[in-house]
Amino acid sequence: MSVMFDPQAAIYPFPPKPTPLNDDEKQFYREKIKRLLKERNAVMVAHYYTDPEIQQLAEETGGCISDSLEMARFGAKHAASTLLVAGVRFMGETAKILSPEKNILMPTLAAECSLDLGCPIDEFSAFCDAHPDRTVVVYANTSAAVKARADWVVTSSIAVELIEHLDSLGEKIIWAPDRHLGNYVQKQTGADVLCWQGACIVHDEFKTQALTRLKKIYPDAALLVHPESPQSIVEMADAVGSTSQLIKAAKTLPHRQLIVATDRGIFYKMQQAVPEKELLEAPTAGEGATCRSCAHCPWMAMNGLKAIAEGLEQGGAAHEIQVDAALREGALLPLNRMLDFAATLRA
């Protein structure tokens, strides 16, 4: 008898923490990376959740700091022949899908994502096959194989609008892999949404009791929440949105103090946007519980200066992203659908 894969029961081993560098070592690797970027005709694209020193280096070298989709779009438009992707593996895959002619390097190919790991292609395909009447919508935080199985790829920034659109056409939805984001979208739209039961290990750890206590300490603070968080956290929020939307909310909200319920890597760009405001981390544990991620993705933390330098210098199988041609073709279709839909929203 086959056993159904249960994303909620899955335990993902965390990678070891990178060895800290002293100031001299940091400066050595920063200069080495700058030199290698020029030698390789490369540009660095970094996610909001990488460490501040990585984001700063991307800025200094003419690169990009953004969400996963904008990272890939920036890379596709840039003249560089090589992209150094500081993030997790699905981000490198997305960049390769959109820029197959470019050399896509990563500091390490072992940088995973719990949402990606929690949606293995064989089990997900069987799930989709069991519901053939539903349109398959998958989050960007998935493998190339899962994207190729989908009808649409979506980011959190346009998830509500896309599901509203599909619902208006009378379509029923399979949503994967994040159950919290799927539930949020369903409540916002009223659509018929069947959710795969994955979750982000960082956002899944935010706790209402601990957050309530923090709100009592800072009663005038606004709460900014990423919709990958549990429903109980989302319901407490003053603003809910994607990484880029939360940064915009930080600027528009009048509050001088902001409690932020997402990966603390976002604080680098958010603090730049609102230097006059105080940013507070939402708690990820409480009532005797201990956090595992402590509001920072352990795989994002693998993108250290030494690893980036090694990726640029060595390349090869340990650092270069490859996507099977057939998978790329299959994944490109739902990605392009999303890009075209997003363009209509901006028009």
UniProtKB/Swiss-Prot annotation:
List its EC numbers.
2.5.1.72
Keyword Electron transport tagged: no
Tell me the residue numbers annotated for binding iminosuccinate. H47, S68, Y139, A140, N141, S156, H226, P227, E228, T243
What reaction does this catalyse? iminosuccinate + dihydroxyacetone phosphate = quinolinate + phosphate + 2 H2O + H(+)
Q: Which cofactor does it need?
A: [4Fe-4S] cluster
Q: Name one Pfam family in it.
A: NadA
Q: Where in the cell is it found?
A: Cytoplasm
Give this protein's Gene Ontology molecular function annotations: 4 iron, 4 sulfur cluster binding; metal ion binding; quinolinate synthetase A activity
Q: What class of enzyme is it?
A: transferase
Q: Family assignment? A: Belongs to the quinolinate synthase family. Type 1 subfamily.
Name the SUPFAM superfamilies on file: NadA-like
Q: Name one GO biological process term.
A: 'de novo' NAD biosynthetic process from L-aspartate
What organism is listed for this UniProt entry? Salmonella newport (strain SL254)
Record keywords, A-Z: 4Fe-4S, Cytoplasm, Iron, Iron-sulfur, Metal-binding, Pyridine nucleotide biosynthesis, Transferase
**Classification via HAMAP family:** NadA_type1
What are its GO cellular component terms?
A: cytosol
Function recorded in the entry = Catalyzes the condensation of iminoaspartate with dihydroxyacetone phosphate to form quinolinate.
Whichever gene encodes this chain, its name is nadA
What pathway does this protein act in?
A: Cofactor biosynthesis; NAD(+) biosynthesis; quinolinate from iminoaspartate: step 1/1
Chief site of localization: cytoplasm
Name of this protein: Quinolinate synthase
Give binding positions for [4Fe-4S] cluster. C113, C200, C297
Q: How is the cofactor bound?
A: Binds 1 [4Fe-4S] cluster per subunit.
